[in-house]
Regions:
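Boundary at the C-terminal end of the N-terminal hydrophobic targeting segment
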Residues: 23-25
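Conserved acetyl-CoA pyrophosphate-binding loop and the N-cap/start of the following alpha-helix
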Residues: 160-168
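Bacterial N-terminal signal peptides that target proteins for export
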Residues: 1-10
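GNAT-family acyltransferases
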Residues: 28-156, 168, 172, 176-210
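Bacterial N-terminal signal peptides
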Residues: 9-19
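Intrinsic disorder/low-complexity segments enriched in polar/small residues
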Residues: 8, 27-28
Length: 210
C-alpha cells in the first residue's frame, strides 16, 4: 500500500513540473511574427485625410456626432441602397433604431482611429445634411491595395451627384492615398465580377487550410 502511495505522489509531482514548464513557456513565448499578421491598410507614417473638400460637399470621418444625419440619410433611401450598395435586405432596413445607428458610428470611429478602415460622411458645405458616404477598406481579394465603396441618397442619385462623386473620389484616392491598385466594386468592377473574385479567394483559402 505504501509503495502505491509513493508511486502516486511521484506521478502527481511529475505532472506539476510539466504544467509549470508549459506555463513558463507560454509566459516567454514571442509575439507572432510579422509574417502572420494582417498587412496594414496604410503605412504607419501615412497621414490619413480627416477633412477633404469637393465641389458642393466635404468629407469628414464618420463618428457619433454624425449619427443622426447619417441615419436620416440612409433611412431616406432604403430600396435604393439595398439595390445599388449592399445588394442585400440586411442594410439598411426600416427597423434600424437610433441606438443601433449610434453603435455603428462608434464602431466606424474606432476602426478609423485604429487605422483598420476609414469611413467618411459626404456632407453639404454647412455640415447639416449628409449626401452620401465613402469607405476605404482592406481588400478581401489579393492584388488590390484597398477597396473603395460609396453611396449617395436616392435624391442625390436622381440629381446626378453619384457620377460626380465617383469621379472626384477616384481622383482623391489617386492623389492623396498611398495605393497603386484600388478596387471599386459596382463601379469600375461589375458586381458579378467582384463577387466571383471573392468566392474564388475564399475557395482557395479553404483548400489551403485543409
Amino acid at each position: 500500500m505504501t509503495g502505491h502511495i509513493f508511486k502516486l505522489a511521484a506521478l502527481v509531482g511529475a505532472i506539476i513540473v510539466m504544467a509549470s514548464g508549459v506555463a513558463r513557456a507560454e509566459e516567454v513565448a514571442p509575439p507572432p511574427s510579422s509574417a502572420t499578421r494582417s498587412p496594414e491598410l496604410v503605412p504607419a507614417s501615412f497621414k490619413v485625410p480627416v477633412r477633404s473638400t469637393g465641389p458642393g460637399f466635404k468629407l469628414v470621418p464618420l463618428g457619433p456626432d454624425l449619427a443622426m444625419i447619417d441615419h436620416a440619410a440612409y433611412m431616406s433611401s432604403i430600396p435604393h441602397l439595398q439595390a445599388t450598395f449592399t445588394r442585400s435586405k440586411n442594410w439598411p432596413h426600416p427597423g434600424i433604431s437610433a441606438a443601433e445607428a449610434m453603435a455603428d458610428m462608434k464602431a466606424e470611429q474606432a476602426r478609423f482611429i485604429a487605422r483598420e478602415s476609414f469611413a467618411y460622411a459626404v456632407l453639404t458645405p454647412d455640415g447639416k445634411r449628409e449626401r452620401g458616404c465613402v469607405y476605404v477598406s482592406p481588400s478581401p481579394v489579393p492584388g488590390y491595395d484597398a477597396v473603395v465603396r460609396m453611396w449617395v441618397t436616392q435624391a442625390e442619385y436622381d440629381a446626378g451627384f453619384d457620377a460626380r462623386l465617383q469621379s472626384w473620389v477616384m481622383e482623391w484616392v489617386r492623389k492623396d492615398w498611398p495605393f497603386r491598385n484600388v478596387a471599386y466594386p459596382g463601379r469600375t468592377i461589375p458586381w458579378a465580377t467582384w463577387e466571383t473574385k471573392i468566392a474564388a479567394t475564399k475557395a482557395k483559402s479553404t483548400v489551403t487550410t485543409q
